[in-house]
A protein has these predicted regions:
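Function-determining surface determinants
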Residues: 1-313
Length: 313
């Protein structure tokens, strides 16, 4: 299964009003306690996988996530384990993901590096209160999930205040429409960093992520695919830049990635105006406030729509 979702950080000034709005949308609340696993040298994190055991209400679910085929998609498989273990976390078992694309991808990764499931050990944990509700727009049903809590690892904790928009059914453009409305109302800013990535950093005692490779796009590919490839390293970096955590190397990479993205956009008349805006942003990589503005988020959402294949719009 592939999930289609976007995640945003919530500025402190908007947290109370957003929480109230979500409660008004016939929401439910669940406590989610999770334990994340990886090899000692972070093989899963380095390969864009996340493997966790999470208590959801009275039961546990083992979840495996991996890289999908688009900017808003990820491989995912959930294996409910029932309520027999109570509050005690059950043992991890990759057999629960047997016969699924996500499970096959993880086993291939372990085999290719000479690892076994026994090499997967606990790295960090999360304790989250999730308030969630479903909303409709443009023929799509989208689940909104407000997550408030903390990540713990390496003897440290990190607060969490974020909201996810996940497509339940309908076209991805409906998800983008709903995300824009909430972004405009509450000043949200797009953040591609998952809890797994942030927890991995916390466990290692580092604040910045890796510097993604910035490569020219293949002009022979469909234009939507070119936009997706050019946008990927940009979205991988904007979370650290907006948090004012980015290293000099990350900022240089972001400026380079924005240059590639602007050049890609200029190939299409409909994106000419956006190309100029993207090029201007390349000169503002040291101004964290720029990356949190509603106008910047609207730009990312437009680019994400252009990155969708024609039959998905």
């Amino acid at each position: 299964m592939q999930e289609i979702e976007l995640k945003f950080q919530i500025p402190p000034a908007s947290r109370a009003s957003l929480s109230e709005s979500l409660r008004d949308a016939a929401s439910a609340t669940t406590r989610l306690r999770a334990r994340y696993f990886d090899t000692g040298d972070r093989l899963l994190a380095r390969s864009a996988f996340a493997l966790r055991l999470r208590q959801e209400g009275e039961g546990w679910v083992q979840t495996l996530k991996g890289r999908g085929d688009g900017l808003m998609t990820r491989l995912e498989h959930n294996a409910p384990l029932g309520t027999d273990s109570g509050d005690a976390a059950p043992a991890l078992s990759l057999e629960r993901h047997a016969g699924t694309p996500a499970g096959a991808a993880l086993l291939a990764l372990l085999d290719s590096t000479g690892r076994t499931p026994a090499d997967l050990v606990l790295q960090f944990s999360t304790d989250i209160i999730r308030t969630h509700a479903e909303v409709e727009a443009d023929g799509a049903v989208v689940e909104l999930a407000l997550d408030v809590g903390q990540i713990a690892g390496g003897g440290q904790t990190l607060p969490v205040w974020e909201i996810e928009f996940e497509l339940v059914r309908g076209a991805p453009t409906g998800l983008l429409s709903i995300a824009y409305l909430w972004t405009e109302a509450f000043g949200l800013w797009l953040d591609a960093r998952s809890k797994a990535e942030r927890g991995d950093r916390l466990a290692r005692g580092v604040t910045q992520g890796d510097v993604p490779a910035v490569r020219p796009v293949d002009a022979a590919q469909p234009w939507s695919r070119q936009v997706a490839v050019a946008l990927s390293p940009v979205l991988a970096l904007v979370g650290d830049v907006a948090d004012d955590l980015a290293s000099p190397a990350q900022r240089v990479a972001l400026a380079q990635a924005l240059g590639v993205l602007a050049q890609t956009l200029r190939a299409e008349a409909q994106a000419a105006g956006a190309a100029d805006t993207v090029a201007a942003l390349a000169g503002m990589v040291f101004d964290a406030a720029i990356w949190c503005r509603v106008e910047t988020q609207a730009l990312w959402l437009s680019l994400l729509e252009w990155s969708l294949p024609a039959d998905a719009r």
